[in-house]
A protein has these predicted regions:
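Glycosyltransferase-associated regions of secretory-pathway enzymes
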Residues: 2-148, 164-443
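Small-residue hinge/turn detector
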Residues: 149-161
């Protein structure tokens, strides 16, 4: 009997319609297709569950071939300097070598004044992020420190990894930057506190610098929103400065505090707090969260280490010293000569308040001296400055005389052995034989 005959046993009408519309071969393979789909969905669900944030008490840092390590931060160390590593001077060689010695499994690259523009064009040009505004802005900036700050943010956004200034020494392997209680897969930025002095937040000069994260060394994943926010904030800020000064970006003049707040630690800190707050479900994140922290903490997927980690030995902010177990790097500051081109406020008599190094008594005394000076008439101020300059000249002359007298004394001391030979030592005879001594006694 034909299966199409009206007299054949048919079952339900829907089943007949399904058999008529679906080929027999496909019906036979259908269970296999369904099984494959189930397996694919199961695999996808396992991957999804594995990527979900884990409670801290269950989190473990995986081994070399674990899933956490393969999804970790790029194993790349970046630095920038005037010249390539083969042309480094001794002090740059010594600090740079610590990064490769302590981290043999990491790649290492230095961008220089000769290849930085090519890097920016490659990654932010038409074949990269296609941001001609960023490329043009970087091309027009002439201030070395501004370009150095911009470049580190652009590198980290494009490729991620570890960035360190050329005068930073690595004390511990990068693998120790993330404590074991955290899962590396849950983090996308590792930073440290640099200055933790909120008591000075209202000071007219120190206020903007009193609470900041360190940006001479940090670790980031590529595409981090903090890095792009920094680049775009700097672009807008430079445009405003150029407009206010009525000059092109290439000709802007910046003082020390403008650099700090525009591209340096203050700008870095603001961008970090903004991103933390945007990610937070409990309201804005302020510096109170990081004031006086003894250990590291994670906020909005950003690991913040205490001041001792990246900024030990500063003499303030409870920064400890470089011999402690918690100190990860050491900043030598030998490449930090940019303030000479971007001077900070220096009073003609009382100097810079930064020389107080955040000592509260010193800062109060400096403020009082400045207030007393400002209360004088212009003629009195001029006389005070002249008296101070004359006193400095007198002290310089006295110091020079002391130095010359010291040289004469050292020269005479060096020539004295030639003029007065040392006295001859008395001749010492070897001890006599005991038997001979007895004979002499008998005589």
């Amino acid at each position: 009997m034909s299966p199409l005959s009206p007299l054949s046993p048919t079952g339900s009408t829907k089943a007949n319609l399904f058999r008529n519309r679906v080929p027999t071969q496909l019906r036979r393979c259908l269970p296999l297709y369904i099984a494959c789909v189930c397996i694919i969905l199961l695999v996808l669900n396992i991957d999804l569950f594995g990527s979900m944030p884990k409670p801290i008490h269950l989190s473990k840092r995986g081994g070399r071939h674990s899933k956490a390590s393969t999804r970790g931060f790029p194993k790349k160390i970046w630095q920038s300097w005037k010249v390539a590593p083969f042309s480094f001077e001794a002090e740059q060689i010594l600090t740079a070598r610590t990064w490769t010695d302590k981290n043999p499994g990491y790649r290492y690259e230095v961008l220089t004044d000769n290849n930085d523009m090519e890097y920016v064009e490659e990654h932010y040009g038409p074949d990269g992020f296609d941001r001609p505004d960023i490329v043009e802005m970087y091309r027009n900036v002439n201030a070395t420190i501004i370009k150095a700050d911009l470049l580190r943010y652009m590198i980290m956004y494009a490729e991620g990894g570890v960035y360190a200034d050329i005068d930073v020494e690595d004390l511990r392997p990068v693998s120790r930057w993330i404590p074991e209680r955290y899962n590396e897969a849950d983090l996308d930025l590792v930073i440290g506190v640099e200055i933790d002095q909120p008591n000075f937040k209202d000071h007219p000069i120190l206020g903007k610098k009193s609470m900041s994260f360190c940006q001479w060394t940090f670790m980031s994943r590529s595409g981090h929103p903090v890095m792009l926010k920094l680049v775009e904030n700097i672009m807008a800020w430079l445009s405003d400065v150029a407009k206010n000064q009525r000059v092109p970006i290439s000709a802007v003049k910046l003082d020390f505090d403008e650099v700090i707040s525009g591209t340096g630690p203050s700008a870095f800190t603001k961008a970090v707090l903004d991103v933390m707050s945007a990610r937070s479900r409990s309201g804005p994140i302020t510096w109170d969260t990081f004031h006086d922290i003894d250990e590291s903490k994670v906020v909005s997927n950003i690991l913040v280490r205490n001041v001792e980690s990246f900024a030990a030995g500063q003499g303030h902010s409870d920064s400890g010293n470089h011999n402690s177990r918690g100190a990860l790097i050491k900043h030598h500051y030998h490449a930090s000569n940019w303030p000479s081109r971007h001077p900070r406020f220096r009073h003609p008599i009382f100097g810079e308040v930064e020389r107080c190094n955040w000592n509260i008594e010193c800062v109060i005394k400096w403020d009082q001296d400045i207030a007393a000076f400002n209360s004088l008439s212009p003629e009195e101020q001029k006389q005070k400055v002249e008296d101070h300059e004359n006193l400095q000249k007198l002290q310089a002359q006295q110091n020079q005389q002391k130095a010359e007298q010291q040289k004469v004394a050292e020269k005479m001391a060096a020539e004295q052995p030639l003029m007065f030979p040392p006295p001859q030592q008395p001749l010492q005879l070897p001890p006599a034989d005991p038997a001979t001594q007895e004979e002499l006694k008998m005589v």
